[in-house]
Regions:
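Basic- and aromatic-enriched surface patches that contact anionic nucleotides/nucleic acids
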Residues: 2-44, 58-255, 334-337, 341-357
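Flexible hinge/switch segments at interdomain interfaces of large molecular machines
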Residues: 45-49
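A short, surface-exposed helix-loop junction/capping segment
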Residues: 51-58
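C-terminal subdomains that position terminal phosphate/3'-OH groups for nucleotidyl transfer/ligation
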Residues: 228, 232-375
């Protein structure tokens, strides 16, 4: 019998100044959510997946590691007509369907129907026949009636409407996901897969980004992509547009980037210039409160994502890369140390309830004032 998909929570790296997205002030009315139930056959879903109408996160597909015995048991369950757990999917505004809970199962169906693996370790027997007709068989080697039984298997889908509030969408998928536990950025990567998510992937794989962040953000959890997503949101949409809902804010940035692919090279240039400036000014203490410790030999602290927001976004506004030896470089270094060390309002804004609208606007306003930059 098919076992439930395992839920292995990824190890979380230590990050300061990071609120779980969705801790903003604004709530959402439950009666605004629209979830409908539909039943589709395996055959119908696979056709739509191959036509890119139903979307599988390509990053997940590349990392697909479901054990072969679990893949075989899924196919065996279909042949034995054992009901499968429901699937949760999200509808895009453009009409495509993004599979969020059930990726392992759909990927397994795709792989088996495409003859990518043999069924192994099964105990299926047909009535009156002691031989196992499916053991060791590729899909094309099965009797036609068993091929049809797999393709005709009915799957229950709960479809979340495209107009549901962003935080509600992620909250629901976080609650219902029965497979490998996904971070909210991994869910965004699936829902908004396109030029924006591919661009984020390219940025975080660069040596410049890895060096500037001290390799502190785990690619497995996509915390690295989330950090860049935050830079893009505050840079493109502006701090003044932030209303306390980080999920919606980050999603808005991804929507913009998907629709304005020609802007991505310019955004990359500003971001990379900012990373180099942060490296020049703060070295191994970039984006860390340990910058305020005396001496260059002080231990490196934990990366603070709120400092990352402030320092990358503000330094990206300077026309040129900033060197520590320059007058502006010395001023910025001194002022940031003072903010981290002596300004209680700034310290609170990068440490507690950091998704709160007031905290976000406070830390940006104080840093912009100290660095001599207009908002």
């Amino acid at each position: 019998m098919l076992e439930p998909e395992s839920r292995n929570s990824p190890l979380e790296e230590k990050i300061e100044g990071y609120d779980s997205a969705g801790n903003g002030q604004a709530g959402y009315p439950l009666d605004s959510l629209f979830i409908r139930q539909e039943t589709r056959s395996v055959s119908e879903i696979l056709k739509r997946v191959k036509k890119n109408r139903w979307i599988l996160d390509p990053d997940f597909q590349r990392a697909f590691v479901w054990p072969k015995d679990k893949q075989s048991r899924l196919i065996e369950s279909c042949i034995m007509r054992i009901p499968l757990p429901v699937f949760y999917v999200a509808e895009r505004e453009s009409g495509e369907i993004v599979i969020v809970d059930g990726l392992q199962r759909i990927t397994t169906f795709l792989r088996y129907v495409d003859n990518k693996f043999r069924i192994l370790g099964t105990s299926f027997r047909e009535e009156g026949n002691q031989n196992n007709p499916i053991e060791g068989k590729f899909f094309h080697e099965l009797p036609v009636k068993l091929q049809e039984r797999i393709l005709d298997t009915q799957l229950i889908m709960y479809i979340l409407d495209a107009n549901a509030p962003e935080r509600a969408r992620l909250d629901i998928f976080e609650r219902v996901n029965s497979g490998v536990a996904l971070t909210r950025q991994q869910m965004r990567n699936a829902i908004y897969n396109g030029p924006a998510t591919r661009w984020l992937g390219e940025i975080v794989e660069s040596e410049l980004f890895r060096a500037a962040t001290g390799r502190s953000l785990r690619p497995e959890t996509m915390r690295d992509r989330e950090a860049v997503n935050r830079f893009c949101a505050f840079s493109i949409l502006g701090v003044e547009k932030y209303r306390g809902d980080m999920d919606e804010f980050l999603a808005d940035a991804l929507r913009y980037m998907n629709n304005h692919g020609n802007d991505l090279d310019a955004i990359r240039g500003k971001f990379e210039k900012s990373l180099r400036s942060n490296q020049n000014l703060f070295g191994k203490h970039a984006f860390r409160k340990s910058l305020a410790a005396d001496g260059s030999d002080a231990s490196r602290g934990i990366l603070n994502i709120s400092l990352f927001d402030v320092c990358t976004v503000i330094l990206a506004k300077f026309p040129e890369e900033i060197e520590l030896e320059s007058p502006s470089g010395r001023k910025i270094h001194k002022e940031l140390v003072n903010l981290i060390e002596r300004n209680d309002e700034f310290i609170h804004a990068i440490s507690f309830f950091t998704n709160n609208t007031k905290a976000v606007k406070t830390r940006f306003a104080l840093a912009e004032g100290a660095f001599g930059v207009r908002g």
